[in-house]
Amino acid sequence: MKTDIHPKYVAAKIKCACGTVIETRSTSGDISVEICSNCHPFFTGKSKLVDTTGRVDKFKKKYKMK
């Protein structure tokens, strides 16, 4: 087999925007993510309902609901 054909497998840190740091190993080094299992609504059980651009109001107006 050929030697030195595999990438280096080094210790890495995954840093989330919420401040969580997870230590793991990777071939690409440190990784930055926007959302992780500590802050994702699916894993936390806390749902955030965001009405972006008034979609609910637009729906109610379209179907004449109060």
Swiss-Prot record:
Gene3D superfamilies xrefs: Ribosomal protein L31
A single GO cellular-component term on record: ribosome
Keyword Ribonucleoprotein carried by entry: yes
HAMAP family found in the cross-reference section: Ribosomal_bL31_1
Lineage summary: Bacteria, Pseudomonadati, Spirochaetota, Spirochaetia, Leptospirales
Pfam families xrefs: Ribosomal_L31
Cofactors: Zn(2+)
Residues annotated to bind Zn(2+): C16, C18, C36, C39
Domain of life, source organism: Bacteria
Name the record gives this protein: Large ribosomal subunit protein bL31
Family in the record: Belongs to the bacterial ribosomal protein bL31 family. Type A subfamily.
Note on cofactor: Binds 1 zinc ion per subunit.
Function, in words: Binds the 23S rRNA.
One BP term from GO: translation
Keywords, alphabetical: Metal-binding, Ribonucleoprotein, Ribosomal protein, RNA-binding, rRNA-binding, Zinc
Species of the source: Leptospira biflexa serovar Patoc (strain Patoc 1 / ATCC 23582 / Paris)
Name of the gene: rpmE
Subunit-structure text: Part of the 50S ribosomal subunit.
Single GO MF annotation: structural constituent of ribosome
